[in-house]
């Protein structure tokens, strides 16, 4: 079997086009465009690339993005004060603080300071809690994007065994909730899991988010499985590789996401979607 490649780039383009069309309609009615505040603390090269792609997407579809590029030395108090100001700004519908933050700033405190209805990353405990209670509003962008990718396979997810490798707050944990919501039986594995191979081999749906190049050997993949590779790792040869050994996995899987061009573009697209949702909810 040769896997069908799920193009995140193509789906992301479709999502962004639909969001842009809705924004055009609102503006044509005399309403303001949605506003997104993007905060970057420090000059981490990877973060600058991510923030750049988010700002570019905003410009393409008509979201007013306001940039706040702060010095690495910015105090936690100063950042929290800025968030308070943005929480009270009626023209700002979404607030995004690019992670990771410098070590002297408590990221949990920062995430919790963002008003839940402006938390377009979907990281606030209130929004995570709503997902757990099966009443989601603003959902974490990467897991939500993955669910949209899974929809394109047209597979019935109910009753399927989904195995997640990685238990981060950003991907693994909310991903488990999304898959539960879709009717999957979910196993979450992490660095303390023994016999990881045994779990991976059982997976009808395999989501890998550990940040280690080709961490999962392709021959572990179950015949016909759906493989979602969240990892994006710059290797010594300069190439970008995912967390799954792509070529070998593609020989066994039914569907697989590429790296790059898989999950990454959908994360940005769902941020745009969430910003529109926040705008509509904020009325």
UniProtKB/Swiss-Prot annotation:
PANTHER family: C-1-TETRAHYDROFOLATE SYNTHASE, CYTOPLASMIC, C-1-TETRAHYDROFOLATE SYNTHASE, CYTOPLASMIC-RELATED
Metabolic or biological pathway, per its Swiss-Prot or TrEMBL entry: One-carbon metabolism; tetrahydrofolate interconversion
Family according to the record: Belongs to the tetrahydrofolate dehydrogenase/cyclohydrolase family.
Main function: Catalyzes the oxidation of 5,10-methylenetetrahydrofolate to 5,10-methenyltetrahydrofolate and then the hydrolysis of 5,10-methenyltetrahydrofolate to 10-formyltetrahydrofolate.
Keywords: Amino-acid biosynthesis, Histidine biosynthesis, Hydrolase, Methionine biosynthesis, Multifunctional enzyme, NADP, One-carbon metabolism, Oxidoreductase, Purine biosynthesis
Protein name: Bifunctional protein FolD
Quaternary structure and interacting proteins, as annotated: Homodimer.
NCBIfam families membership: PRK10792.1, PRK14186.1
Catalytic activity: (6R)-5,10-methylene-5,6,7,8-tetrahydrofolate + NADP(+) = (6R)-5,10-methenyltetrahydrofolate + NADPH; (6R)-5,10-methenyltetrahydrofolate + H2O = (6R)-10-formyltetrahydrofolate + H(+)
CDD domains: NAD_bind_m-THF_DH_Cyclohyd
Classification via InterPro entries: Aminoacid_DH-like_N_sf (IPR046346), NAD(P)-bd_dom_sf (IPR036291), THF_DH/CycHdrlase (IPR000672), THF_DH/CycHdrlase_cat_dom (IPR020630), THF_DH/CycHdrlase_CS (IPR020867), THF_DH/CycHdrlase_NAD-bd_dom (IPR020631)
HAMAP family: THF_DHG_CYH
Gene Ontology MF terms in the entry: methenyltetrahydrofolate cyclohydrolase activity; methylenetetrahydrofolate dehydrogenase (NADP+) activity
SUPFAM superfamilies given in the database record: Aminoacid dehydrogenase-like, N-terminal domain (SSF53223), NAD(P)-binding Rossmann-fold domains (SSF51735)
E.C. number: 1.5.1.5, 3.5.4.9
Gene Ontology CC: one annotated term: cytosol
Gene Ontology biological process terms, A to Z: L-histidine biosynthetic process; methionine biosynthetic process; purine nucleotide biosynthetic process; tetrahydrofolate interconversion
Claim: Hydrolase is one of the keywords in the record: yes
Gene (UniProt): folD
Cell wall biogenesis/degradation found in the keyword field: no
């Amino acid at each position: 079997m040769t896997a069908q490649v799920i193009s995140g780039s193509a789906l992301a383009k479709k999502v962004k086009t639909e969001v842009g069309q809705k924004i055009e309609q609102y503006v044509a009615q005399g309403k303001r465009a949605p506003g997104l505040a993007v905060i970057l603390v420090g000059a981490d090269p990877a973060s600058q690339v991510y923030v750049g792609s988010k700002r570019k997407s905003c410009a393409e579809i008509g979201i007013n993005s306001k940039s706040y590029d702060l010095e690495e030395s910015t105090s936690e108090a100063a950042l929290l004060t800025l968030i308070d100001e943005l929480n009270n700004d009626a023209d700002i519908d979404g607030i995004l603080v690019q992670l990771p933050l410098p070590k002297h700033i408590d990221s949990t405190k920062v995430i919790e300071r963002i008003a839940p209805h402006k938390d377009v990353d979907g990281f606030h405990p209130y929004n995570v809690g709503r997902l757990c209670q099966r009443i989601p509003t603003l959902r974490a962008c990467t897991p939500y994007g993955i669910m949209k990718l899974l929809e394109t396979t047209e597979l019935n997810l109910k009753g399927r065994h989904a195995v997640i490798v990685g238990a981060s707050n950003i991907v693994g944990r909310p991903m488990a909730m999304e898959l539960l919501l879709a009717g999957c039986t979910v196993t979450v594995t992490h660095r303390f899991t023994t016999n990881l191979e045994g779990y991976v081999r059982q997976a009808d749906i395999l989501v890998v988010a550990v940040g280690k190049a080709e961490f999962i050997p392709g021959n572990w993949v179950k015949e016909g499985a759906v493989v979602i590779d969240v990892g994006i790792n710059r290797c010594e040869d300069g190439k970008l590789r995912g967390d799954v050994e792509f070529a070998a996995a593609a020989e066994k899987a039914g569907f697989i996401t590429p790296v790059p061009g898989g999950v990454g573009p959908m994360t940005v697209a769902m941020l745009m979607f969430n910003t529109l949702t926040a705008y509509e909810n904020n009325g």
